[in-house]
């Protein structure tokens, strides 16, 4: 038995049992309640055969990728590429209705990938990790990602790298097994990520620049803009690009929202919990950040940081 599968069976048996529930893809031609109707186009249902229930309906291009196949493929790849699980922490969640799965493997001290200490503050450590997410109801697209979790900040900053082109829709052309091959380059991926954060941390921003980033990311949403301002852990006049990035990831991590207090023209906000499912919110907001980080607006600051770092080295 491969290492990850044994660990999940031993330490996360309830979630593992959910993940390995037998599922099947069945073609549906008719619906009835109470009258029988024929569908114009057949649909395909992901069916929980153990509990005799349909999880979700899909079109003809959908490929069912059972959670068990994902876990077995990941487990085999970890063993194949020598990624041991000694001194790791696992966060494993499968929705009771089998709608989605999320597994995180975090590498602690004295593990295969010990945390990275930032150069400007050795107490500011970033913990490495791997995350896999998927769903049967199409609410979450399959992803396998390298990740960082910041340990010293109040909100637990996290960041992801998609390990190349492994963010895929479940179409008939998708090969889930091929996605795990990227794990052989995991050490290089982590090294590039930590270098990126050192670059972010090298660039001090003015208050106007911080405001510009929050405004562009918020895309006209006053609630989102004010949430970012409240979760920024540093003074806007004394923040780096790293600090601002930390605030963006707080937005994605904590499923919070800013709600206006008082009259219509009030500028006061309070932070409250969002009503959305936390894991679905997490994944959706992560995608927002990924898109913004790739935008010309953020890339401008990244290139500015590279130039600033180059001048310091010279």
Located regions from the model:
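Intrinsically disordered, low-complexity regions enriched in serine/threonine
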Residues: 1-31, 108-314
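A generic structural signal for beta-strand entry/edge sites
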Residues: 43-44, 52, 100-102, 141
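Structured alpha/beta or helical-core interaction and ligand-binding surfaces enriched in interleaved
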Residues: 57, 70, 75, 79-90, ...
């Amino acid at each position: 038995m491969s290492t990850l599968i044994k660990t999940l069976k031993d330490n996360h048996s309830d979630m593992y049992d959910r993940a390995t529930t037998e599922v099947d893809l069945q073609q549906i031609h008719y619906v009835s309640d109470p009258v029988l109707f024929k569908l114009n186009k057949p649909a395909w249902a992901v069916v929980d055969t153990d509990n005799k229930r349909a999880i979700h309906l899909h079109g003809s291009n959908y490929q069912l990728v059972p959670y068990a196949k994902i876990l077995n493929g990941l487990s085999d790849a970890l063993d194949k590429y020598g990624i041991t699980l000694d001194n790791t922490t696992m966060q494993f969640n499968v929705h009771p209705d089998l709608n989605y799965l999320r597994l995180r493997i975090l590498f602690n001290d004295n593990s295969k990938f010990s945390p990275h200490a930032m150069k400007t503050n050795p107490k500011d450590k970033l913990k490495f990790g791997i995350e896999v997410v998927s769903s049967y109801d199409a609410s979450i697209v399959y992803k396998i990602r390298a990740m960082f979790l910041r340990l010293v900040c109040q909100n637990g900053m996290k960041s992801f790298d998609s390990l190349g082109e492994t963010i895929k829709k479940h179409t008939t052309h998708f090969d889930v097994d091929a996605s795990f091959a990227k794990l052989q380059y995991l050490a290089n991926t982590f090294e590039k990520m930590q270098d990126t954060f050192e670059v972010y941390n090298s660039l001090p921003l003015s208050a106007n620049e911080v405001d510009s980033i929050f405004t562009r990311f918020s895309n006209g949403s006053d609630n989102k803009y004010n949430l970012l301002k409240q979760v920024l852990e540093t003074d806007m006049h004394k923040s780096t690009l790293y600090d601002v990035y930390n605030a963006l990831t707080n937005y994605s991590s904590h499923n919070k929202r800013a709600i206006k207090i008082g009259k219509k023209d009030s500028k006061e906000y309070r932070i409250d919990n969002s009503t959305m499912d936390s894991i679905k919110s997490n994944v959706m907001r992560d995608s927002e950040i990924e898109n913004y980080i790739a935008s010309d607006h953020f890339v401008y600051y990244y290139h500015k940081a590279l130039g600033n770092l180059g001048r310091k080295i010279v």
